[in-house]
Amino acid sequence: MRQTTFVKHQEVKQKWFVIDAESKILGRLAAFVASRLRGKHYPHFTPNVDMGDKIIIINAEKILLTAKKEDQKLYYNHSGYPGGLRVRTAREMRAKKPIALLERAIYGMIPHTKLGDKQRKNLYVYSGSEHPHLGQNPEKLEVK
């Protein structure tokens, strides 16, 4: 009789990967990265264990939005005070903080739980082509 095996967090070996976001479409890249951060690409995926990889994204300011989303996609923030709703377009978000578009898209695709918080900490996004994680020898990863 076969038994289902579950991976323990001590058995997980996290790998480092670097992704160049230049000329990549925001939603497709975000979905790919979110899946990698959760570890869903592994055949022994266990939903209650942080088994995802560590992902470094460079050139986040050069990400693409399709159609007219640059001006029509809206991001909402609320301060918690009456009348404190702030609405910004994707163009305004990119001008103010270029990595916010990508981080927010990826964070929205990861569960909002304690485990999701751990998985979000494995994401490193940089607006330029340089990153400080050369000591980890990250492998280059191509998005499909």
Curated annotation (Swiss-Prot):
GO terms for biological process: negative regulation of translation; translation. InterPro entries: Ribosomal_uL13, Ribosomal_uL13_bac-type, Ribosomal_uL13_sf. GO terms for cellular component: cytosolic large ribosomal subunit. Keywords: Ribonucleoprotein, Ribosomal protein. Disulfide bonds: none annotated. It holds the Pfam family Ribosomal_L13. Coiled coil: none annotated. Transmembrane segments: none annotated. This protein is one of the early assembly proteins of the 50S ribosomal subunit, although it is not seen to bind rRNA by itself. It is important during the early stages of 50S assembly. HAMAP family: Ribosomal_uL13. Part of the 50S ribosomal subunit. This is Large ribosomal subunit protein uL13. It comes from Mesomycoplasma hyopneumoniae (strain 232). The gene is rplM.
